[in-house]
């Protein structure tokens, strides 16, 4: 048997059933790996909680076999954006450094109720704002991959801790959140699978809000099958979340048939950037490779146009910043947030927010407050919402003639940890993921190969609303051709 840490969730489950090892042994092996990790992926470790859950899993595996699920005894990590009862939840911000929730978020509760073993909380960009996991009060996360010349690279963001932990074999799968690409982009940088479901498919109760009309929980795993297994329990209607969709959750694993003959795959011309920018050539070559894989399996390739794509990124940053400025207004040191005391209340507000919020978070709050101000609301926020509808309509029209859309996930490979990118260049990392987020569509990132620098490159499959099973199946076909690049 190969290294226990490198098994997939499905393989771990199979071995637990066969009693090749116990859930406690599996969990302890992961705890040992976490204690020796150099990636800075885990910021809060919960070994006692994990071992207690593992013992319960072993009891079920031996004495209550009718209660066994595919996640029984499987060690997972939780992005520090999701509330965990009696366990610190900080959003990697100094302003929440001492916050301990009294309840579990719905998706965390559903994972635990399904038998998963929580190993701890994972590093992230502060309040999920970032594409490199360098905006964290706990310090940056390192990608398990290194460039061919030995240079360390970023894991992507904002779910950088989640992607690094899964790619670094510190947990079997991880919970992340995706607002504009925060599951898919780090999955691409780390060479793993990252799935963002349809907006409303998973409850947002207990997920610290960044941009409420965009935020959605997602999963990061090492295989497509594992993504289906981990996504299954966290989906479903939640009466306590007004944005939760009251729709039946299918069995996602049943959709992975690897049969795609006759499926129409849309290739949007607006995502082809190599004719303008030479640095995108490698990504375009991998995109063509993915197209060939699907074509050889019987899929029909259709050229499509998403004409408002070029507006998606600026629209996204206006909307998400506006919503962030509203959501983060509550952290003032009075009811929420770590207070910096002062005799003057205005000074107390200023010191509390000025000292405890990071540079990127403050930048977006300022952008958002400006966009929502009375003199500029119509010119910026209102106009952005109108263009968001046009971006959404592009997808709606395209899905009348195609079943799925195939694009790159990120325009380039992971960049160096010490590379100082300007803000605009950093934002461009989400150029391919943001459109699906604005439309609320499900999308998955799947590794396609390695760059000349021996770093992962990935493709994104976008599906129609609530067709997570379909995008998992397309991703599985690509995975069949590429194999697991982590090997």
UniProtKB/Swiss-Prot annotation:
Question: EC number(s) for this protein?
Answer: 6.3.5.7
Task: Please name the PROSITE patterns in this protein's record.
Answer: AMIDASES
Which reactions fall under this protein's catalytic activity? L-glutamyl-tRNA(Gln) + L-glutamine + ATP + H2O = L-glutaminyl-tRNA(Gln) + L-glutamate + ADP + phosphate + H(+)
Among InterPro entries, the record links this protein to:
Amidase, Amidase_CS, Amidase_dom, AS_sf, GatA
Q: Which GO terms describe its biological process?
A: translation
> What cellular component terms from Gene Ontology apply here?
glutamyl-tRNA(Gln) amidotransferase complex
- Which SUPFAM superfamilies did the record assign? Amidase signature (AS) enzymes (SSF75304)
Q: What does this protein do?
A: Allows the formation of correctly charged Gln-tRNA(Gln) through the transamidation of misacylated Glu-tRNA(Gln) in organisms which lack glutaminyl-tRNA synthetase. The reaction takes place in the presence of glutamine and ATP through an activated gamma-phospho-Glu-tRNA(Gln).
Q: Which NCBIfam families match?
A: gatA
Subunit structure as annotated in this protein's UniProt entry: Heterotrimer of A, B and C subunits.
Q: Would you tell me the protein name for this molecule?
A: Glutamyl-tRNA(Gln) amidotransferase subunit A
